[in-house]
């Protein structure tokens, strides 16, 4: 129930709104007049009768006439005298309060009378609808303020011309027009409309020549001379019937109406009695149907009044030509309602532009045949589905001038062309001729600087990929050429400049493109990249080589320094290894020094105990293990030190193995080819200070970076680094001044194949192609394109690639260079040899120091030996004297008392252990006389011994006598001790005891 109540309330609300609207409409309608007089100024009685009949029928058409509204007609006959016409309008139409006036006139009577009606009615703001006036003057709303017409003006035929040119693909035309208002209007309409029209189509027509003539011609010969020298053979002509006869007559005499020429004329010229066969013209549909236009004008008026009644109050029309009725505001608003009408009438779709001129008017395309027969070959009419005008032409039915069925090219095709090129290896090589040269080589072509005034400009020869292509192209499509170099050495880019008096900036091209745009050259044969900016102003053939953009860089190389052999380890690791060697050596020494088992004595041996590991031996051991050298002596003795030694040996094995592996990786293995991964490399997108990239300023690559929004940051960075030419940039890449050069892939691949140190990085991006540039609308475009396609199919382009771009032998050598393992040379290992040299020099230096030190030590030792010898000699002398005195004293004692006996221990025996160690051991200081007889004899001097078989003199009587053997037989003479080893002698005087 709630839902039903909601619906009921909405229905009640809607009904109330409708009733209120109807009430408001009834109120408005009640304030508006119920009768409307429509005036007619017509050319004949039939038109007057048809006008009255149409209004009567209108009153019964509820679609256009509201209830209680009635239309009445008020007509007068159009008078040839415009002044009389003005009076008739005031007396017979305005006095009857006409709300609008429909005007027609005879085509032969001129436009003065319709203009008089327009002036008079416009002065009182009464709308006027013309059905036959087509002059351009009626479009001027400053004069004809309230004039509309159901027929288009003559100059609207320019719109149809553009459609026809687009249909036939003509790109260059000559416009012929009279110097009157309509002639200049059609030229202005063509130029204005073409600027917006060609935004929606691919083919753009340009005006090569404009020929303006004074009406009422007597001769057109002078203009024909200029037309004949022009390139275009398509003529768009606006002329009256009389002037067209003169033009066709003179053009026929110059053979400009025959084969190869195209004439497209307006309606008036189509009716000349000498129109040549093959001429195409336009004819307005329903142009002479006054009845149809009368009906359409009446219904347009009724439609406007009906809408105005529903929206506002219409004031009464002026009643007389007095001053009191000058400002009729309702008439001005009614004129605006009329301009907004769009209905389907008897003459087609009826609508108006801001000037009140008919739009959507249909035309027939007429082809003149033999005996001036007019044959309709097409229509320009309104398409209801697309809600716009559409051109339909049956090309097969057209007979062109010269009775040709094939469409003319519309242009005079020159067979001798001005061809421009530019130095760009390997596509174009430029060589200056020597002083003794007079011609180029067979594979070269002369190529002077374009428009150069210097006499030396002709001393250049060109060869290369593009030159071979040009030679073959000229043979294939049969043309001759003059080859020249770019005047400024640039491909060309546009500069925005402000023309005098212009509100907007216009593009002005430089370089090769500028020469082509300004029509100073016919063709560009060079590595010219196809891009949208250039294609807007020049024509391109199909690409003769497909390519893209890539990055050129120098292959990364490790710098081979004197310490290259140290590269496998970082500096930190080397320092740690050096420190570890000495730390381990120190710990080994300490472990061996303080271990209770660090020193021991060999069992069953008279030798001293083996010495412990000292610090120098520990260092020697640590280095020996690390360097994998044999250790002969100085090894640890304790178990703890030996455990550390084994761990150190394992450490040394790992370090040496790692060093060996990394040394191979650093010095022998293949180096990486590139440093950059491509255009998406983060180092390029966020350019760092140590990474510079650039391209050629004003080039197609430069334009590409300008277009790409995602590369804007990168472009702003590289813009300051851009070069004037690609050659300069490539040289800087080789020198290492530029890290990345971004350019066309064809050129960079060529450079990389020529120099093994250069390489292209990443994949191609910005793919495009090289094309041959021609003028916009050039007749050679299709022929050049077809020839290039044939070259691709026949393999000719592939042959040029192999010959000029991919140098097979150079590339093969680069591949062999890359595949061959890198070998270590002196540059890599020089540091090792220097290290050996330093070791040798250090050893020599140390031995010199040792020799010098030893000499100093020997000199010191000699001085000590001399002093010791002198002391020994002095001591010997003293001891000898003491010995003699002692002997004499003993002899005296012996002589005094034979029974006196000396204690054996009173005489000391000094032995030189250094010279006679064995004797020193057996005759130690603890042994004294008497002793072993043999020992006594061995130490006595010869003069103290008796003769063989006798006892010594020193023996007492109480002592047993022992026979002595012959010394000469039992003891060799050399075993006799020297005098200083006699009893009582010692080298140390302090030990001498007598």
From Swiss-Prot:
Q: Where is the composition biased (Polar residues)?
A: 984-994
Q: Which residues lie on this side of the membrane: Cytoplasmic?
A: 592-648, 850-994
Which region is the signal sequence? 1-23
Q: How does it sit in the membrane?
A: Multi-pass membrane protein
Task: Tell me the residue ranges located in the Extracellular compartment per UniProt.
Answer: 24-570, 670-828
Per the record's keyword annotation, is Transmembrane included, yes or no? yes
The answer to whether the entry has keyword Ribosomal protein is no
What are the recorded GO MF terms, alphabetically?
A: glutamate-gated receptor activity
> Region annotation Disordered: residue ranges?
971-994
- Which InterPro entries does the record cross-reference, listed alphabetically? ANF_lig-bd_rcpt, CaM-bd_C0_NMDA_rcpt_NR1, Glu/Gly-bd, Iono_Glu_rcpt_met, Ionotropic_Glu_rcpt, Iontro_rcpt_C, NMDA1-like_ligand-bd, NMDA1-like_N
Q: Which residues bind glycine?
A: 527-529, 534, 700, 744
A single Pfam family it belongs to is CaM_bdg_C0
Subcellular location per UniProt equals: Cell membrane; Postsynaptic cell membrane; Postsynaptic density
Q: Which GO terms describe its biological process?
A: calcium ion homeostasis; chemical synaptic transmission; ionotropic glutamate receptor signaling pathway; long-term memory; olfactory learning; regulation of membrane potential
Q: Where is this protein primarily located?
A: membrane
Q: How does it assemble?
A: Forms a heteromeric NMDA channel with Nmdar2.
Please state which protein family the record places this protein in: Belongs to the glutamate-gated ion channel (TC 1.A.10.1) family.
- Which named protein is this? Glutamate [NMDA] receptor subunit 1
Report the source organism. Answer: Drosophila ananassae
Upper lineage ranks? Eukaryota, Metazoa, Ecdysozoa, Arthropoda, Hexapoda
């Amino acid at each position: 129930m709630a839902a039903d109540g909601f619906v009921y309330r909405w229905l009640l609300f809607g009904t109330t709104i409708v009733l209120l609207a109807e009430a408001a409409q009834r109120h408005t309608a009640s304030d508006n007049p119920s009768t409307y007089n429509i005036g007619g100024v017509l050319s004949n009685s039939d038109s007057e009768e048809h006008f009255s009949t149409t209004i009567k029928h209108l009153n019964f058409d509820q679609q256009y006439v509201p209830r209680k509204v009635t239309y009445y007609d008020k007509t007068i006959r159009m008078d040839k005298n415009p002044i009389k016409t003005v009076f008739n309008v005031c007396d017979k139409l305005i006095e009857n309060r006409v709300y609008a006036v429909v005007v027609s006139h005879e085509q032969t009577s001129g436009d003065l009378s319709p203009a008089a009606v327009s002036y008079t009615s416009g002065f009182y703001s009464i709308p006027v609808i013309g059905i036959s006036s087509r002059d351009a003057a009626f479009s001027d709303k400053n004069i004809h303020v309230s004039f509309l017409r159901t027929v288009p003006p003559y100059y609207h035929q320019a719109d149809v011309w553009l459609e026809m040119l687009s249909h036939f693909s003509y790109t260059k035309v000559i416009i012929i027009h009279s110097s009157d208002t309509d002639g200049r209007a059609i030229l202005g309409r063509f130029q204005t409309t073409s600027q917006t029209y060609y935004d929606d189509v691919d083919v753009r027509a340009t005006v090569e020549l404009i020929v303006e003539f004074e009406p009422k011609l007597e001769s057109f010969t002078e203009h024909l001379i200029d037309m004949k020298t022009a390139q275009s053979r398509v003529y768009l002509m606006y002329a009256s019937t009389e002037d067209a006869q003169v033009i066709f007559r003179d053009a026929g005499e110059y053979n400009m109406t025959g084969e190869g020429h195209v004439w497209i004329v307006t309606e008036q010229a189509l009716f000349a009695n000498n129109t040549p066969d093959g001429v195409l013209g336009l004819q307005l549909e329903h142009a002479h149907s006054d009845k149809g236009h009368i009906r359409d004008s009446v219904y347009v008026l009724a439609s406007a009044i009906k809408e105005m009644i529903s929206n506002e109050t219409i004031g009464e029309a002026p009643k007389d030509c007095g001053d009191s009725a000058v400002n009729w505001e309702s008439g001005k608003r009614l004129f605006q309602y009329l301009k907004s009408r769009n209905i389907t009438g008897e003459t087609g779709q009826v609508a108006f532009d801001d000037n009140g001129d008919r739009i959507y008017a249909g035309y027939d395309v007429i082809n003149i045949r033999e005996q001036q027969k007019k044959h309709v070959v097409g229509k320009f009419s309104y398409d209801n589905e697309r809600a716009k005008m559409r051109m339909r032409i049956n090309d097969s039915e057209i007979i062109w001038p010269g009775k040709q069925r094939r469409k003319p090219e519309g242009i005079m095709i020159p067979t001798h062309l001005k061809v421009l090129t530019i130095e760009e290896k390997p596509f174009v090589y430029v060589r200056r001729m020597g002083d003794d040269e007079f011609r180029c080589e067979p594979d070269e072509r002369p190529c002077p600087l374009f428009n150069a005034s210097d006499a030396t400009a002709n001393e250049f020869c060109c060869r290369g990929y593009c030159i071979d292509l040009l030679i073959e192209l000229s043979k294939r499509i049969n043309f001759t050429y003059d080859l020249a170099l770019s005047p400024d050495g640039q491909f060309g880019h546009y500069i925005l400049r402000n023309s005098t008096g212009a509100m907007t900036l216009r593009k002005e091209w430089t370089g090769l493109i500028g020469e082509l745009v300004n029509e100073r050259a016919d063709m560009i044969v060079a590595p010219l990249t196809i891009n949208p900016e250039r294609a807007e102003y020049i024509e391109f053939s199909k690409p003769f080589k497909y390519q893209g953009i890539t990055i050129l860089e120098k292959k990364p190389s490790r710098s081979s320094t004197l310490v290259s052999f140290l590269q496998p380890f970082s500096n930190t690791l080397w320092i740690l290894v050096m420190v570890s060697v000495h730390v381990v050596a120190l710990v080994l020494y300490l472990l061996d020094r303080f271990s209770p088992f660090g020193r021991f004595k060999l069992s069953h041996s008279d030798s001293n105990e083996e010495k412990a590991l000292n610090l120098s031996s520990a260092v020697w051991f640590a280095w020996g293990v690390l360097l994998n050298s044999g250790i002969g002596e100085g090894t640890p003795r304790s178990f703890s030190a030996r455990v550390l030694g084994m761990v150190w040996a394992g450490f040394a094995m790992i370090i040496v193995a790692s060093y060996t592996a990394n040394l191979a990786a650093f010095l022998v293995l293949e180096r990486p080819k590139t440093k950059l991964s491509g255009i998406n490399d983060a180092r390029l997108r966020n350019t760092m200070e140590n990474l510079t990239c650039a391209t050629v300023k004003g080039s197609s690559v430069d334009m590409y970076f300008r277009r790409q929004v995602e590369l804007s940051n990168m472009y702003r960075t590289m813009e300051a680094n851009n070069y004037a030419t690609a050659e300069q940039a490539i040289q800087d890449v080789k020198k290492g001044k530029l890290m990345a050069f971004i350019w066309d892939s064809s050129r960079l691949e060529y450079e990389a194949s020529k120099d093994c140190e250069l390489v292209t990085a990443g994949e191609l991006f910005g793919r495009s192609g090289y094309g041959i540039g021609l003028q916009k609308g050039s007749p050679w475009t299709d022929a050049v394109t077809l020839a290039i396609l044939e070259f691709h199919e026949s393999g000719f382009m592939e042959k040029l690639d192999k010959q000029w771009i991919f140098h097979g032998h150079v590339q093969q050598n680069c591949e062999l260079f890359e595949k061959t393992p890198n070998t270590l040379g002196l540059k890599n290992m020089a540091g090792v040899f220097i290290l050996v040299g330093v070791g040798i020099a250090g050893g020599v230096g140390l031995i010199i120091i040792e020799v010098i030190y030893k000499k100093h030590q020997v000199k010191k030792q000699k001085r000590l030996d001399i002093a010791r010898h002198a002391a020994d000699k002095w001591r010997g002398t003293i001891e000898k004297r003491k010995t003699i005195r002692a002997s004499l004293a003993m002899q005296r004692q012996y002589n005094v008392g034979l029974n006196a006996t000396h204690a054996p221990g009173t005489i000391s025996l000094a032995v030189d252990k250094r010279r006679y160690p064995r004797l020193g051991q057996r005759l130690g200081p603890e042994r004294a006389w008497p002793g072993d007889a043999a020992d006594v004899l061995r130490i006595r001097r010869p003069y103290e011994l008796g003769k063989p078989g006798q006892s010594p003199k020193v023996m007492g009587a109480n002592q047993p006598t022992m026979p002595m053997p012959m010394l000469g037989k039992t003891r060799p003479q050399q075993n006799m001790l020297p005098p200083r080893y006699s009893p009582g002698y010692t080298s140390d005087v302090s030990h001498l005891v007598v």
